[in-house]
């Protein structure tokens, strides 16, 4: 009864929102993304047909790469840190807190996971250590932005810069260099028979982190669509006054969402370094912009966990294709692939006008504010 009353109060308090305008924006956003997806599928179909007809042409080579099991396996592996960070970004931003410090959370968790694994000898202990480090840094970000009402963009950049300096420095102090020694990597999980399939077999013979990602995407979707907590997060980002009127703490919901973003980003960073067995801290570190691509992914996915995952898989797939083509002697500049996600989102934003950004994202809120 209490929960139902809260839902009614939230609906009544938010009745003045421009529903028609928001609905129009939503339809436009999804229509454009559907058009982009349909165009991509059609282009892939044409390429595969051309490759089958002319196997010795560049189309044939591309078709061979696209249907390669190794390409799918590589795309899944590359998508892990980006997709986990994207899920974390969705939770934070849907609650009204813009967390652009995802890059920093990936960096700190990637280093800590390797360090704890090297210290204890336990891969999963290291994984948990990386998640805890990311969550602590996210907690610091939450205190600064929610409690002290700091600018969220500046605070997010500070998180990135802190991690960018701290992780290589710690590696230098502990290991006398920006790169850590190698540690054991987790064994792949293989499903008998299914793992032998020509292309989709890569789905059934992968690192545990890939299956953990699948589970996290499904659970994130369920939380947003089927739970009261998910509705509270959406209300906190769309109409915090309605949530406050219903008797739910906006501050508490935002703290929980930001900490959850730290957990998810930490899972991505830990899995990334542990799957490779090493942390490299040269330059922008091994993370190298994946946290920023995660932001692009959830924007392109319109703040939907499944959409963000599919966007991530698309971007990671382009990177995987580029890698395979390089191995086959067809050079495509890596920098060109790296800017593709950002170009795609700019095009989508130009066509749609804007993504369905939460109304109160970036705004501070105190209980009782008018």
Show which residues each predicted segment covers.
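Cytosolic-side transmembrane-helix boundaries in multi-pass membrane proteins
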Residues: 1-50, 220, 246-252, 325-370
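Transmembrane alpha-helical segments in multi-pass inner-membrane proteins
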Residues: 279-342
